[in-house]
């Protein structure tokens, strides 16, 4: 009996010891909160693997449209420095800057502009956790990361900077992941896609022979231009399935055309990007015969659009323009739409405030354009 008892005690002691060893091993294998990795690896739009902090509280943005995406994500509180262009350029063509004047009070971290030139020393001084960039060559991106010792993440609007492309959506998702704004990124993407779907559903079944022909002039392209500056596959036209005469050229993106070509097309309706409206008005005074030969001018079918392509694509403005174009071209399909109210609905969602009134005061807004003969 004693031998059995001793045997049982021995087994029990061995079992307890074994459990203790197992517990110690588990404790050793499970990192404590202080030992857990505090960085994550992400892949940016250049396909670069970048290691960023798990929690990002301070950021800067360099390049056309970069800051806009951060505003869309409701993350302006994390921005600790901005480009000089964001301070010096008037904000009226950039709804995100109208809605957030406080951004102009932040330290300058570089020149900005079409060819962004970040200042590594200025960036280091504001101590960002992450640098977001757009439209910067890969070698310059790598050099900036090396000089600052701060992770640089590339975002993109896509090759043609339209407001419906996968690179744009991937950029929102990536920035959302880094900034802890994943849910907001999903909401923004869904909002843009819903607008696209709504515009398409209203117009997709209209036969081409029932559509008026349209043309847009005054498109900005590395500066301001007049009526000869247009765009093939103009995104707001594409959104409402409009019959763009310039699409006959078989190209995509910005083109300059001759006045003779515009006369040959003789579109039913002409839209003017208000960024170039002043040049069109001046040209009208010099070339009245040309303009008055166009049926759109003769019939009073010339309308103003808000310029949306400034420091790359202002997504909200492009969508608002598309709704206004739909209202003009297919009034029966857009009976329920007030373009000005729709614009403010879009701006409020994307940038946090209704800014159409300010844009209208400075740029002209949605209206029929009058040309005195």
UniProtKB/Swiss-Prot annotation:
A lipid is attached at residue 21 (S-archaeol cysteine). Pfam families: Peripla_BP_2 (PF01497). GO terms for cellular component: plasma membrane. InterPro entries: ABC_Transporter_SBP, ABC_transptr_periplasmic_BD. Keywords: Cell membrane, Lipoprotein, Membrane, Signal. It is found in: Cell membrane. PROSITE patterns: FE_B12_PBP, PROKAR_LIPOPROTEIN. Residues 58-333 form the Fe/B12 periplasmic-binding domain. It is a lipid-anchor. Residues 1-20 form the signal peptide. Its main location: membrane. This is Uncharacterized lipoprotein MJ0085. It comes from Methanocaldococcus jannaschii (strain ATCC 43067 / DSM 2661 / JAL-1 / JCM 10045 / NBRC 100440).
């Amino acid at each position: 009996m004693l031998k059995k008892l001793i045997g049982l005690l021995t087994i029990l002691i061995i079992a307890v010891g074994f459990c203790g060893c197992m517990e110690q091993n588990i404790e050793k294998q499970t990192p404590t909160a202080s030992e857990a990795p505090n960085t994550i690896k992400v892949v940016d739009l250049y396909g670069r693997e970048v290691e960023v902090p798990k929690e990002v509280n301070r950021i800067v943005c360099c390049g056309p449209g970069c800051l806009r995406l951060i505003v869309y994500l409701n993350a302006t509180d994390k921005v600790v420095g901005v480009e000089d262009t964001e301070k010096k350029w008037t904000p009226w063509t950039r709804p995100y800057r109208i809605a957030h004047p406080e951004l102009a009070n932040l330290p300058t971290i570089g020149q900005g502009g079409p060819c962004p030139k970040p200042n590594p020393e200025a960036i280091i001084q504001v101590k960002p956790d992450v640098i977001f960039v757009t439209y910067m060559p890969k070698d310059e991106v790598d050099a900036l990361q090396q000089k600052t010792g701060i992770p640089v993440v590339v975002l993109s609007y896509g090759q043609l900077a339209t407001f419906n492309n996968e690179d744009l959506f991937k950029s929102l998702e990536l920035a959302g992941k880094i900034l802890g704004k994943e849910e907001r990124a999903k909401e923004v993407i869904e909002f843009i896609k819903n607008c696209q779907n709504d515009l398409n559903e209203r117009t997709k079944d209209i036969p081409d022979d029932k559509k008026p022909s349209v043309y847009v002039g005054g498109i900005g392209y590395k500066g301001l231009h007049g009526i000869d500056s247009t765009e093939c596959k103009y995104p707001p036209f594409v959104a409402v399935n409009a019959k763009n005469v310039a699409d006959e050229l078989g190209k995509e993106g910005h083109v300059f055309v001759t006045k003779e070509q515009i006369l040959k097309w003789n579109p039913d309706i002409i839209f003017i990007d208000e960024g170039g409206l002043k040049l069109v008005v001046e040209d009208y005074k010099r070339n009245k015969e040309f303009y008055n030969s166009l049926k759109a001018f003769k019939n009073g079918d010339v309308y103003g659009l808000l310029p949306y392509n400034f420091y790359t694509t202002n997504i909200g403005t492009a969508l608002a323009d598309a709704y206004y174009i739909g209202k003009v071209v297919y009034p029966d399909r857009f009976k329920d739409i007030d373009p000005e109210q729709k614009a403010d609905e879009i701006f409020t969602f994307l940038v946090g405030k209704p800014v159409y009134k300010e844009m209208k005061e400075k740029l002209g807004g949605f209206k029929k354009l009058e040309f005195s003969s």
